[in-house]
């Protein structure tokens, strides 16, 4: 069963990352690094969910209105909950690696910009094929990673980036069948994208769409402005 096999593989990845995180957090850092930062966790989850949903919704709605995207039915592939659990494990493990212990450790000694460069290089090492999807696809993937770094910096927690990353992956991959996380490509809705490649995204679908690129860029601007405002207020205080 492909769904179970992927769940098992992602479960192993998650277990390894959880052990790595807890080991270094407790044995090396003696719990001095706040990775999860559960204070205001409801707020963190809420910000994360909105950040993950926004680019999908703001891309799908215009495409549906101008009929570049058409709905043609429901795909009853089965094992939906197992696929969702696999996405959950994959996302949590990825966030523990990219914006968990390493992000907090580097951020303790360096500024946000160099830490983001390091995390982006690590992200590229995990996804070496993103440039094969074209310029817009690569830009969307890199901006998505940058948004999550901004989110981690803004909330000082891995919880918000995880929530954003999970809901985005669940919607784009499992619901709309756009983002390719698994070779089997499970999806719930049968959608057809047609017309101008800049809008339809071509083979990359939503992640290859210029509307998605604009949405990701606006999210980056929003969090950069929020961080600047917070820094200004802290200096005044």
Model-derived regions, located:
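Aromatic-anchored segments of alpha-helical transmembrane domains
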Residues: 56-62, 120-129, 166-175
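Functionally important transmembrane alpha-helices
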Residues: 137-197
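Specific transmembrane helices
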Residues: 1-91, 176-234
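Residue-level signature of the transmembrane alpha-helical core
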Residues: 11, 49, 53, 84, ...
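Function-critical hydrophobic alpha-helical transmembrane segments in multi-pass membrane proteins
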Residues: 74-133
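Alpha-helical transmembrane segments and their helix-entry boundary regions
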Residues: 44-48, 101, 115-116, 158-162, ...
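Hydrophobic/aromatic residues in alpha-helical transmembrane segments
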Residues: 20, 58, 89, 98, ...
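Helix-capping/transition residues at the boundaries of transmembrane alpha-helices
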Residues: 63, 103, 107, 152-153
């Amino acid at each position: 069963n492909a769904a179970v096999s992927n769940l098992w593989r992602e479960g192993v990845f998650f277990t390894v990352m959880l052990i790595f995180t807890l080991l270094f957090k407790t044995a090396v850092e003696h719990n001095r690094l706040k990775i999860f930062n559960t204070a205001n966790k409801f707020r963190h989850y809420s910000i994360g969910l909105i950040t993950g949903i926004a680019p999908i919704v703001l891309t799908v709605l215009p495409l549906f209105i101008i009929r570049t995207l058409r709905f043609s039915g429901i795909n009853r592939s089965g094992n939906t909950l197992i696929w969702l659990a696999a996405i959950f494990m994959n996302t949590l493990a990825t966030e523990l690696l990219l914006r968990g212990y390493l992000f907090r450790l580097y951020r303790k000694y360096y500024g946000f910009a160099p830490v983001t460069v390091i995390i982006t290089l690590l992200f590229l090492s995990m996804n070496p094929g993103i440039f094969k999807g074209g310029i817009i696809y690569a830009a969307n993937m890199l901006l998505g990673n940058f948004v999550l770094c901004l989110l981690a910096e803004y909330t000082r927690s891995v919880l918000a980036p995880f929530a954003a990353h999970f809901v985005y992956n669940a919607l784009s991959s499992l619901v709309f069948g756009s983002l390719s996380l698994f070779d089997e490509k499970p999806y719930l809705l049968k959608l057809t994208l047609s017309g101008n490649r800049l809008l339809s995204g071509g083979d990359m679908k939503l992640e290859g769409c210029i509307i998605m690129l604009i949405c990701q860029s606006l999210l980056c601007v929003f969090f950069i402005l929020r961080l600047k405002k917070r820094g200004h207020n802290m200096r005044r205080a």
